[in-house]
Amino acid sequence: MASTVESSSSSSTKARGRLAVLSAHLASISIGSNDDPFLEPWCLSAQSTVAPPPNLKGELTVVDERTGKSYRINVSKEGTVKATDFKKITSGKNDKGLKLYDPGYLNTAPVRSSICYIDGDEGILRYRGYPIEELAESSTFVEVAYLLMYGNLPSQSQLADWEFAVSQHSAVPQGLKDIIQAMPHDAHPMGVLVSAMSALSVFHPDANPALRGQDLYKSKQVRDKQVARILGKAPTIAAAAYLRLAGRPPVLPSSSLSYAENFLYMLDSLGNRAYKPNPRLARVLDVLFILHAEHEMNCSTAAARHLASSGVDVYTALAGAVGALYGPLHGGANEAVLKMLNEIGTVDNIPEFIEGVKNRKRKMSGFGHRVYKNYDPRAKVIRKLAEEVFSIVGRDPLIEVAVALEKAALADEYFVQRKLYPNVDFYSGLIYRAMGFPTEFFPVLFAIPRMAGYLAHWRESLDDPDTKIMRPQQVYTGVWMRHYLPPKERMISNEADRLSQVSVSNATRRRLAGSRN
């Protein structure tokens, strides 16, 4: 145990050292100042040339060649059709009507939302109509969270009230701290965050519709209290998970600091109440929080809305969302990018790596996106932010590999034709590493700001008259019917699926070898 604690302490000291170096350098240089803006003017001018979608309202005529019947399907102004309209198309052979088969929801919209707009072909991302580049340049995460939640940027007094409400809910119950401290010293921070979010449901029974009635969330006051609670407590829980990993006790939050400053304070103050993080370092983190705050119906947001549709409390719904974000295909991509860049090693190895990708022998992480078929607008901001950070602390050798890899890929027809551009994960991991965060903490840095997006969708779903408990259909492909037989009469085919060999520990083997008389 002593060696493990020593290792954790060494890792913690190393991380604090990197943070101290970065903080000292940032003290003399303003990140995101007017002299070197994140927002390049051409970004907005290019967006202004993209016209809003036209009115697509109309009708489709569907002719069923099985029966010769024709059906008229209404098309909404947004270009959608109701899936249930296809249920009326039947073969006349006692079927239940057509179902739409869409694995992965590639072309299915289960909700109508006004929170986030994405045009993947044009590389556009907007929160409530505001370009992400503009918000990253001029706003703060807390202000953006208000925008996502309530639809408009707050006035000065509204912002002050909002900041106060969030900061006043930043402390977590002692019982929750005890739960976190009881976890293994090497517990993955995302596992800690998922568990803690779920446990908050127990500590706040006043917010549970299962205990207080299904109409509980019809109260705007009740909703808003949960929003402030979660936004306030998320960084505190995340900091406790980080400190647990480093073998250190949790630190009380400070209500006098900004959102990002408070988070860094809890990580690095070592309990010194006079400690204050460098404001420029906090600004770097704040911009990253803005970029990760919302991204419409991604896997984890869809999970949050799916769970919330059952009427479950918001803490359980968000615990499920964070669990989805824990998946390596969703929240762990920037860690995969770092691993890839380390494997490439040097710029000289890039041509060989590129050929390996094209021959399907290697996998390129950080390129391509389910939605974007253009350069991810968040990646543009993050790359500029990375350049700022590395110009201050010195260039990590991997940034040279990353820049050269991007240049090689964007000059290769193989990637251009497939519209594989850098995404938000390509550079973010490099920034987090330079700031001293261990790779296992990267998805937590994704989850903290994404709470704002989850909560905005939760609030929106509560007011949406079309919200129903989510219950997707399936296409049954199993055996039609068979009858029960006693075990001794069953003939099992060798091709039948069966339990694989379950490994046991040596201690279990020792126990099984003993006498049972």
Predicted features by range, described:
Residues 2-5, 26, 40-517:
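Hydrophobic alpha-helical bundle cores within soluble ligand-binding/oligomerization subdomains
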